């Protein structure tokens, strides 16, 4: 077994973030007598995604991201009389209820754990929120550690973040480590900067970029144990595996 130190992203790799996000938005909007329409939801996604990209590129701070996303949304919609920072705090609290996992996350982690792999979660999320979600997910018995960017002072894809993580994993060896995640810009790019192999969870059948060294590509966590435990390089993907 070449890889026995498995580094897994949280959102949209292990955890169903779109579901958690939607439920949290609906609840928070409802608490303020507002309705989350599909168009408002889409607008928020655009604003939030753009801010997270800026955060990954060190163009803004985490505090700026969290304090401005709803301010931008309300300003665009012409909504007044709501404290956007307080609204964000309420949203993060509600987001903490989102413990639904991705398909085959439980089975995958259990298989790898029972085979002797050491599993670690690497996430850019907000620490208190992520830990609540993970604690309620049922996944934590399989993991040896969780590294949240907020607690390290760095974020994926920065090499400093991975250096922080690697220094805290006993007997860490880059040759034995595999980074698994859905995000090309944070997980796969981060693995490149850190000098570890990467497995891309390609959930939406995207074309892989030529500039990133992706060792493996999967469309479902169901396929990950075959790569790690049996050295599979490729396999037939069935529609029901996603």
Question: Can you annotate each of these PLM segments?
Answer:
Residues 123:
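Conserved phosphate-coupling serine/threonine residues in phosphotransfer and NTP-handling enzymes
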Residues 34, 117, 196:
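Short glycine/serine/threonine/alanine-rich loop segments
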Residues 104-108:
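A short acidic, amphipathic alpha-helical/loop segment
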Residues 2-103, 113:
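N-terminal helical cap/lid subdomain that shapes the substrate entry/recognition surface
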Residues 113-119:
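Short, conserved structural micro-motifs that define repeat-unit consensus positions
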Residues 1-6, 19, 110-113, 126-242:
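Asp-based, Mg2+/Mn2+-dependent phosphohydrolase catalytic module
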């Amino acid at each position: 077994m070449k890889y026995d130190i498995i580094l897994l992203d949280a959102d949209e790799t292990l955890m169903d973030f779109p579901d958690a996000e939607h439920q949290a938005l609906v609840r928070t909007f409802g608490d303020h007598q507002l309705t989350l329409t599909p168009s408002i939801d889409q607008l928020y996604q655009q604003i939030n995604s753009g801010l997270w990209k800026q955060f990954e590129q060190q163009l803004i701070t985490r505090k700026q991201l969290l304090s401005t996303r709803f301010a931008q949304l309300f300003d665009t919609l012409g909504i007044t009389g709501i404290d956007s920072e307080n609204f964000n705090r309420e949203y993060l609290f509600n987001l903490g209820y989102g413990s639904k996992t991705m398909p085959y996350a439980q089975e995958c982690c259990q298989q790898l754990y029972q085979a002797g792999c050491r599993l670690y979660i690497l996430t850019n999320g907000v620490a208190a929120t992520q830990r609540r979600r993970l604690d309620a997910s049922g996944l934590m018995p399989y993991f040896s550690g969780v590294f949240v960017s907020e607690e390290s002072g760095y974020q994926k894809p920065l090499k400093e973040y991975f250096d922080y993580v690697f220094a805290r994993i006993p007997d860490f060896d880059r040759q034995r480590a595999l980074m698994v995640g859905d995000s090309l810009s944070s997980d796969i790019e981060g693995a490149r900067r850190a000098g570890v192999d990467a497995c891309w969870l390609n959930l939406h059948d995207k074309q892989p970029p030529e500039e990133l060294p992706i060792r493996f590509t999967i469309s479902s966590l169901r396929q990950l144990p075959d790569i790690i435990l049996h050295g599979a390089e490729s396999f037939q993907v069935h529609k029901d595996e996603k």
